[in-house]
């Protein structure tokens, strides 16, 4: 038995390009073209035109399903195959769920994208507003910077011109110093454009620097000479100080020698020491400390020390003229009156010691009136005094000039009651300015200490 060939349709779907089969669901549109039902349904949902001829398809302008009655070659009609609808339903349901899930995902993404687009649109609007507000500010800044740049360029030009003028002024000053006709010579150092000729200016500066260098050298030489003069003056001052120190030491030595056991061999000195002097009329020392205020080992005070404890020199009243210091500038025996003050032999002064107010000598000498006027006035009458004679002394001077004189053989004085009652007197005698002491234990030799 021979097999008979099955009948089939000869055509294809223009959308999916698959063959059209008899058992497929085939649909047709108003223009006459046929497609798979699923393909044309999706197409019409997207765009209502025919995929082949681009004819507009109305809402109900297509046939959903076509049926074809194709007979076999033997003339018998072909039986349609049996279809399992349950399996088809399951497949379609599964495909529908998958597509729904995809649709939900796409909807979510679409929503998110829409939100993003909205936020971006708002941001764009904000940025536009911001830039619209910034544009005038930036434009004003640009204008300000443009004006500032123009002013800066102008100031730079002015600065350059000022520098050129300053150079010209300095050059003119230098030229004025070196030349009396600066205005005439100024044209020689300037170019045609008015700028300074640097080469000629440098030459002038070199000559100026040379002159200043010469002046500096001369000043340095003068400074060296002045330094040498200062050094020589310093050396001379040091030498003068040394000489002064030596002379002072010599004077002190002479004063110490005058305080040593020295016999009175000078006639003029003896004549001067002959008369008595009131106690308050003590003369001032000749630039040094007083040396007559000495204390002997036995505690007896000298004549002037006793008077000083009793009545200070500043309290002596002056009757006619001010008491002036006694001056021996014209005397050749001045060194005898300059005696140092020996402080190491001082002791505590007795409070009740009465001053000695008389010195007795056996010869007399006239005293000038100027010296008499310096002596305080006589307050009480003086009793008659007996003057002891001073014998001729032939003893040699002591070998120890710095030894203090002894007061064992001092001249006899009156009793203490008479000394207290005695007042200062004005006399024509100068011997009261000095205290007489002895320098040895012998009763035959007498010595005098000069103040």
From Swiss-Prot:
GO molecular function term, any single one: zinc ion binding
Subcellular location: Nucleus; Chromosome
Enzyme kind, highest EC tier: transferase
Keyword Glycoprotein: no
Region of interest (Disordered), ranges: 270-297, 389-442
Physiological role: E3 ubiquitin ligase that acts as a key regulator of DNA repair in response to replication stress. Acts by mediating ubiquitination of the CMG helicase complex, promoting the unloading of the CMG helicase complex by the p97 ATPase (cdc-48.1 or cdc-48.2).
Pathway involvement of the protein, from the record: Protein modification; protein ubiquitination
PANTHER family: E3 UBIQUITIN-PROTEIN LIGASE RFWD3-RELATED (PTHR46569:SF1), E3 UBIQUITIN-PROTEIN LIGASE TRAIP (PTHR46569)
Name used for this protein in its record: E3 ubiquitin-protein ligase trul-1
Family assignment from sequence similarity: Belongs to the TRAIP family.
Reactions listed under catalytic activity: S-ubiquitinyl-[E2 ubiquitin-conjugating enzyme]-L-cysteine + [acceptor protein]-L-lysine = [E2 ubiquitin-conjugating enzyme]-L-cysteine + N(6)-ubiquitinyl-[acceptor protein]-L-lysine
């Amino acid at each position: 038995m021979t097999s008979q060939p099955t009948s089939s349709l000869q055509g294809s779907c223009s959308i999916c390009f698959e063959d059209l089969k008899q058992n497929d669901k085939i649909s047709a549109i108003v223009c006459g073209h046929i497609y798979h039902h699923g393909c044309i349904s999706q197409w019409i949902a997207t765009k209502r035109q025919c995929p082949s001829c681009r004819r507009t398809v109305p809402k109900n302008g297509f046939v959903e399903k076509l049926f074809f009655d194709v007979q076999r070659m033997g003339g018998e009609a072909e039986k349609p195959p049996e279809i399992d609808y349950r399996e088809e339903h399951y497949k379609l349901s599964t495909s529908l769920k998958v597509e729904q899930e995809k649709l939900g995902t796409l909807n979510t993404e679409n929503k998110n994208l829409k939100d993003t687009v909205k936020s971006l649109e708002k941001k764009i609007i904000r940025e536009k507003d911001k830039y619209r507000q910034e544009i005038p500010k930036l434009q004003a800044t640009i204008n300000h910077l443009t004006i500032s740049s123009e002013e800066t360029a102008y100031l730079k030009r002015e600065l350059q011109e000022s520098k050129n003028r300053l150079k010209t002024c300095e050059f003119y000053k230098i030229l004025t110093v070196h030349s009396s006709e600066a205005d005439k010579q100024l044209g020689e150092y300037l170019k045609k454009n008015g700028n300074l000729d640097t080469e000629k200016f440098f030459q002038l500066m070199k000559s100026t620097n040379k002159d200043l260098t010469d002046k500096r050298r001369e000043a340095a030489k003068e400074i060296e000479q002045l330094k040498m003069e200062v050094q020589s003056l310093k050396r001379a001052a040091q030498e003068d100080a040394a000489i002064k120190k030596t002379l002072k030491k010599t004077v002190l030595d002479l004063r110490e020698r005058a305080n040593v056991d020295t016999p009175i061999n000078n006639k003029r000195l003896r004549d001067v020491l002959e008369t008595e002097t009131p106690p308050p009329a003590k003369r001032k020392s000749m630039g040094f400390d007083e040396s007559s205020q000495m204390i002997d080992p036995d505690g007896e005070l000298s004549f002037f020390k006793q008077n000083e404890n009793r009545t200070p020199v500043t309290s002596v009243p002056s009757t006619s003229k001010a008491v002036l210091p006694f001056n021996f500038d014209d005397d050749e025996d001045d060194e005898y009156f300059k005696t140092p003050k020996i402080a190491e032999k001082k002791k505590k002064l007795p409070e009740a010691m009465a001053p000695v107010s008389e010195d007795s000598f056996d010869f007399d000498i006239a005293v000038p009136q100027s010296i008499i006027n310096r002596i305080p006035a006589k307050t009480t009458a003086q009793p008659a005094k007996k003057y002891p004679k001073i014998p001729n002394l032939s003893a040699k001077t002591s070998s120890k000039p710095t030894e203090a004189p002894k007061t064992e053989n001092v001249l006899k004085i009156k009793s203490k009651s008479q000394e207290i009652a005695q007042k200062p007197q004005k006399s024509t005698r100068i011997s009261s300015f000095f205290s007489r002491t002895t320098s040895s234990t012998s009763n035959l030799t007498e010595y005098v200490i000069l103040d």
